[in-house]
Design a protein with these regions (language model features):
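Hydrophobic alpha-helical scaffolding
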Residues: 27, 52, 134-138, 181, ...
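Conserved S-adenosyl-L-methionine
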Residues: 77-184, 189-200, 209, 242
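Conserved Class I SAM-dependent methyltransferase catalytic core
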Residues: 91, 214-242
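Non-catalytic, mostly N-terminal accessory regions of nucleic-acid modification and defense proteins
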Residues: 1-99, 160-169
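A short, charged helix-loop
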Residues: 204-212
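Extracellular loop and loop/strand-boundary signature of outer-membrane beta-barrel proteins
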Residues: 1, 212-214
């Protein structure tokens, strides 16, 4: 499984170890546990081959449903890696994604993409299609986003891991890559965000020609806002939750 993951740029996403005695037991106990696990997927209720909802994305929707409930049940804020569909839909409509006409040439970017739910909803509101770009700091959440894209058949989505403010992954030469549309739900009031970005930002997010100033070090909201502005094309549109 690890080799398959690496071949598809999903290294570190699949961490299941079916030889782990501490989790599965030993000998007959392990065999029984694995047999029960396989039996779950043999349940006839999971056979969707005769389902008449041919156009529904059952697997993808089920995956998002599980992520939403995991966030709630685990006590983590859903905003950490999941944006509710209703909020995502409003953001997509606000920036006019329904008017995008250039197909895959249209670019949509989320600088703090989490599990990718906001990007996928933006794509749903773009009838002509688009190319998705996302960056996420947490490596495990990047895995969730990549799986989410695959399950929703967005195989061309470009999801990368890294600190968006201090290590932006989408660049053109020595400048930030710019996009047609940006949607974002960055972490609220991030503390100690100022690292390699420093006071003289090499991407001129804190001002070029007109000095804007460095955002407060103990509150990263403004830093994400300036990153979004700098990552927009001159004719671009953006919506964010701050």
């Amino acid at each position: 499984m690890a080799a398959l993951a690496e071949e598809n740029q999903l290294g570190g996403v699949f961490v299941a170890d079916f030889e782990d005695d501490t989790k599965l037991g030993k000998g007959k106990d392990k065999v029984e546990t694995l047999s029960k696990l396989i039996a779950v997927f043999q349940n006839e209720n999971l056979d969707f081959s005769k389902n008449r909802a041919a156009d529904d994305d059952l697997i993808g929707d089920a995956y998002e449903y599980l992520m939403k409930n995991f966030a709630t049940e685990s006590g983590k804020s859903k905003g950490q890696f999941y944006t509710p569909a209703e909020v995502s839909r409003v953001m997509a409509e606000v920036i006019g994604l329904g008017n995008a006409k250039n197909g895959r040439k249209t670019t949509i970017y989320d600088p703090t993409c989490g599990s990718g739910s906001l990007l996928l909803r933006a794509m749903c509101e773009t009838p002509g299609g688009a190319t998705l770009y996302g960056q996420e700091k947490d490596n495990a959440t990047v895995g969730l986003a990549k799986m989410n894209m695959i399950l929703h058949n967005e195989i061309y989505a470009d999801i990368r891991q890294g600190d968006t403010i201090n290590d932006p992954q989408f660049k053109e030469g020595d400048q930030l890559k710019t996009f047609d549309y940006i949607v974002a739900n960055p972490p609220f009031s991030t503390k100690s965000w100022l690292k390699s970005a420093k006071f003289e930002d090499e991407y001129h997010r804190w001002g070029e020609g007109i000095k804007i100033g460095v955002p407060p070090e103990k509150n990263g909201d403004y830093a994400f806002l300036l990153h979004i502005v700098r990552s927009l094309k001159q004719t671009g549109c953006a919506a964010g939750i701050l």
